[in-house]
């Protein structure tokens, strides 16, 4: 059992400043004014306006070595559950009793200064206090258990955890409508490598192209050890293999809008009846049908998380110096460069650039690395 510690955790400052009264003497009669009875100091701000601290319990360490802060709660009055989806300030939680609860989040969890955009994410394991005699059943989330295997992105400089407690990332792209974006695959692969989750590359709508034309792309990723699945939600091609890859795992499905994420999941389990919409013929871009990440239990064990479509994906907590280490094909050449801090872009005697020139390293993948590196360098300067 993990060793428990206690630490002092910071809380966010109150969002609103207390207004200063401008009419404190308006109701007084000047002739009856007793200056001796008036207070000498007006208190403008209380402790709530300052950075607050509270003792929280710490159990063990995360994979990244960060201590997960947990509030002490009365566990005997709580149930355990998993968050199915988050909608605004409410979370849909599947309790350990098999019941679904509509839960609010304890305010102190929302004010913990964690740097996260939202306190709760789909897939979170939580301790919640049920509210008696409510229909539908309601509860209050008291504690969020330590996470592992998260899919996060950067939104306005803050970490947005899209889903937590996963062990597989299914990256869904389409051959056409919308067009295939290998660079988005590479970004999501970096996210998977960073989060230590197994990536699964799913190429949907292969009925719109000749499979032979995709072999160079499929071969590039397969040689690096990635599993690549050509699929068609329309014809059912490859869907059985996709279902076997999901069985018994906690998988998040991510990709652009319109690539057919929800359509593929509907083929696997029609009872989910996920909403789908055709691609816009004007822009050739997908339309959002999934607005919140939602957890869907699988009958064969495990679960999948359908996520809203992404057109751009900004990496979270990846510095430019780390990017090359998350490219499996570039990694073997890093130690062969002349300079230990080589960025593999302009330096002399760079083993990575030499491998590209000799054809040992895919040129498109190298261009994708350079583009991602430039994006991360710009973010670091902002």
Predicted regions and their residues:
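C-terminal effector/interaction modules appended to NTPase cores
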Residues: 1-193
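Helix-rich effector regions associated with P-loop NTPase G domains
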Residues: 1-52, 74-77, 115-125, 130, ...
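A generic structural motif
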Residues: 88-89, 98, 136, 248, ...
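Conserved beta-strand/loop subsegment of P-loop NTPase cores
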Residues: 166-173, 195-204, 225-230
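Conserved hydrophobic/aromatic pocket- or pore-lining residues that grip, position, or stack substrates
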Residues: 192, 246, 264
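Canonical P-loop GTPase G-domain recognition
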Residues: 198, 207-259
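A conserved segment at the C-terminal end of the G1
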Residues: 261-277
């Amino acid at each position: 059992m993990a060793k428990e510690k206690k630490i002092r955790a910071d809380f966010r400052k109150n969002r609103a400043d207390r207004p200063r009264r401008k009419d404190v003497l308006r109701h007084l009669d000047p002739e009856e004014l007793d200056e001796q009875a008036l207070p000498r100091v007006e208190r403008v701000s209380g402790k709530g306006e300052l950075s607050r601290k509270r003792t929280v319990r710490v159990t063990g360490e995360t994979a990244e070595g960060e201590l997960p802060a947990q509030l002490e709660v009365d566990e005997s009055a709580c149930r355990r559950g998993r968050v199915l989806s988050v909608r605004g300030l409410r979370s849909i939680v599947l309790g350990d009793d098999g019941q679904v609860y509509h839960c609010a989040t304890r305010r102190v969890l929302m004010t913990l200064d964690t740097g996260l955009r939202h306190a709760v994410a789909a897939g979170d394991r939580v301790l919640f206090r049920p509210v008696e005699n409510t229909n539908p059943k309601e509860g209050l989330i008291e504690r969020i258990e330590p996470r592992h295997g998260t899919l996060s992105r950067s939104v306005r400089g803050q970490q947005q955890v899209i889903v937590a407690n996963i062990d597989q990332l299914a990256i869904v792209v389409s051959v056409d409508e919308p067009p295939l974006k290998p660079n988005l695959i590479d970004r999501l692969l970096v996210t998977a490598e960073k989060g230590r989750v197994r990536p699964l590359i799913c190429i949907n709508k292969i009925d719109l192209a000749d499979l032979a034309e995709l072999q160079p792309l499929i071969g590039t990723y397969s040689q690096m050890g990635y599993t690549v699945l050509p699929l068609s939600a329309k014809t059912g091609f490859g869907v059985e293999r996709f279902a076997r890859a999901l069985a018994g795992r906690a998988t998040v499905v991510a990709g652009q809008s319109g690539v057919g994420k929800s359509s593929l999941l509907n083929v696997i389990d029609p009872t989910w009846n996920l909403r789908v919409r055709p691609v816009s013929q004007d822009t050739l871009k997908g339309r959002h049908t999934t607005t919140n990440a939602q957890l869907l239990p699988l009958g064969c064990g495990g679960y999948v998380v359908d996520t809203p479509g992404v057109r751009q994906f900004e990496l979270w907590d990846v510095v430019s110096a780390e990017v090359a280490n998350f490219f499996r094909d570039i990694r073997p050449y890093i130690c062969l460069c002349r300079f230990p801090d080589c960025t593999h872009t302009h330096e002399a005697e760079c083993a990575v650039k030499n491998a590209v020139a000799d054809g040992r390293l895919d040129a498109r993948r190298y261009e994708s690395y350079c583009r991602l590196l430039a994006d991360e360098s710009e973010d670091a300067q902002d």
